[in-house]
Design a protein with these regions (language model features):
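Surface-exposed cleft-lining segments at the edges of enzyme active sites
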Residues: 35-39, 129-134, 154-164
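Short glycine-/acidic-enriched loop or helix-start segments at secondary-structure transitions
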Residues: 17, 72-75, 79-81, 165, ...
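Metal-dependent phosphoester-hydrolase catalytic domains
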Residues: 124-133, 174-186, 191-263
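Structured beta-strand-rich core segments of catalytic domains in phosphoester-bond hydrolases
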Residues: 65-149, 237
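Soluble or luminal CAZymes and related metallo-dependent hydrolases
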Residues: 41-50, 67, 111, 136-137, ...
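N-terminal, active-site-proximal structural segment of metallo-dependent hydrolase catalytic domains
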Residues: 1-78, 85-97
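Active-site beta-strand/loop signature of hydrolases that rely on acidic residues for catalysis
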Residues: 5-9, 50-75, 145, 153-156, ...
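Short, solvent-exposed loop/turn segments at secondary-structure junctions
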Residues: 10-13, 68-70, 89-91, 124-125, ...
Length: 263
């Protein structure tokens, strides 16, 4: 059975135009859209645009990071998916920060609060668990999801810089292996490390049989107990663009990563 997996850091539900000149304080403060000949930067709630892209892509499991907590139900409904949400950092005043973020997402940015959201299509979720990896400098949580099929998913947004990321990844990976026991496992998310910059990925493959990393990316989909059908790859920038007012709006500052595994 093929399992199509996707991981995507949603950048707190914001867009990120390729032209830096469009990322202005004028837009951030006044909510005014900025334009060039091909792209537009908007400062408004984009839940419908993110939901439309996610719903239209082909995947069985989606690992999302920096997901606005207020979006979890809407994204799950749009994708006809079961959901497992764990809150991560800066969620102290959610009713207030959520209201501000809905009005002006670029102004509040990451201070809205965040979550790791795992979405699952075509099967039920049998178990939901989480592990708090650290509280400082930011709260980092790994989300463990066991599906009715037996497949296990661990969704992580690791800390930066490299030393913190390596510790988060190592701790979460050991916990993931223990939690999954002998069942197949997909371990991924925004790991904040490129395989070219750290030996942690070689260690994960050697000691825990978790592989392969995504070339040139900090977002990864590693698997154990599954064959690799299509190796992890970053989607082209244009694949995360939507059209608004005749111009392209590029969602998030991260490209999604997709892979196919065979059980």
């Amino acid at each position: 059975m093929a399992v199509r997996a996707l991981t995507w850091n949603l950048f707190h539900g914001r867009d990120f135009p390729p032209n830096p000149a469009l990322r202005t304080w004028r837009s951030r403060l006044t909510r005014r859209s900025e334009r060039d000949t091909g792209h537009m930067q908007v400062n408004r709630d984009l839940v419908e645009e993110f939901a439309s892209l996610l719903a239209g892509w082909s995947w069985d499991v989606a690992l999302l990071q920096e997901c606005p907590p207020r979006w979890s139900r809407a994204l799950a409904a749009a994708c006809h998916a079961a959901a497992h949400r764990v809150l991560t950092s800066r969620n102290w005043l959610l009713p207030v920060t959520s209201a501000i973020a809905e009005w002006n997402p670029d102004l509040i940015a990451s201070w809205e609060g965040g979550s790791n959201l795992t979405l699952v299509r075509g099967t039920r979720i049998d178990e939901r668990r989480s592990l708090v990896l650290r509280r400082l400098p930011e709260r980092r949580v790994a989300a463990f999801t066991r599906l009715e099929t037996g497949l296990c998913i661990v969704n992580l947004h690791a800390s930066g810089p490299n030393a913190l990321a390596e510790r988060d990844i190592a701790a979460a990976a050991r916990w993931a292996i223990e939690s999954a026991a002998d069942t197949p496992l997909i371990f991924g998310g925004d790991l904040n490390l490129r395989s070219e910059d750290s030996s942690i990925f070689d260690e994960l493959e050697r000691s825990l049989a978790l592989a392969p990393p995504t070339p040139g990316a900090i977002d990864h989909l590693l698997a154990r107990g599954l064959d690799v059908g299509e190796r992890p790859r970053s989607l082209a920038p244009e694949e995360r663009e939507v059209e608004i007012g005749g111009l392209a709006v590029r969602l998030s500052d991260h490209p999604p990563v997709a892979a196919t595994f065979i059980d």
